[in-house]
Amino acid sequence: MTTEVTTRGARTEHAPARWRWTPRGPLHLGQTLRVLGRGAEDPTCRILGEDCVWITTRWNRLPVSARFTRPAGVTGTNPLHRDVLVEAWGPGAEGWLPTAPRWVGHEDSWEDFDSSAAFAELPHPLVRTRHEHPGLRLPATGNLLERAVVAILEQRVTAIEAVRAYRALLRWNAEPAPGPAPHGMRVPPTPEQWRRTPSWQWHRAGVDPARSATVMRTMHRAAALERLALDPDPARVRTALQSIQGIGPWTAAEITQCTHGDPDGVSVHDYHLADYVCWFFDHAPGSDERMLELLEPWRGHRQRVVRLIKASGHRKPSFGPRLSPQDHRHH
């Protein structure tokens, strides 16, 4: 059930547009949206609590900031079943608002997976994790260009480097979030703004020429990618994304996991993921090939299995070489 609380005619310039709905089944707001964030000071996604998340985005290239909350329900109501309220500000708010339920996985159904024979083959710790985290959903934001920039900046570097670069580039090139968004939040740049980013800014942010060139190539195909974002098949989207030089299987999977709620996309060539998954199943490090072999029984739902492993609290041993931050500003 969905209910638009504030109509177009009733909304004033400074009042938010609102959308409230009852989720189908349990929903954990913070756990579902956390995958979109990059640290506590992310300029485009702030998790302020399990039931309060701020995001910024664009709708038809118009700025939007939005706050997801869970209004208090009837006494005794399971918190995972309470309504979701979204309040949005900015020129793109009313157009974006009907897409808000997809951001928290409203169309993501685990039912086929939960009732499948493959689910019964999951290791017991993952079955237990699924029962302990019934509100975990896969978000489908649809913001292909925005997620592409995040994924490209994360190529071949540490998370610290990527986060630092993203924050700096948005601080220099992005406009402040509309409405009462938390301090420091900004709206992702438009394709035109990215294309105008001077080379010295990429350099100063610590982004090497290969990654900045990939962002530029992506933004030069912005119109085509905005159409591609409407394709509901994440596998087709992954394939199409890889036609852009500099975007491979890892980057494409990282994008569609967030934009399309991709239940099967696996981030191969990730510096940590193969070992992480292999340690869970084999209690030993392993290759991408071994990871895919281990996940094969759950094809069609492999990303769900990866999310369950992460939600289980599994940690692989921390010995071995670490990827150290690199300073590309002197290259």
Task: Please identify what each model-predicted range represents.
Residues 1-331:
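HhH-family (HhH-GPD) DNA N-glycosylase catalytic core used in base-excision repair
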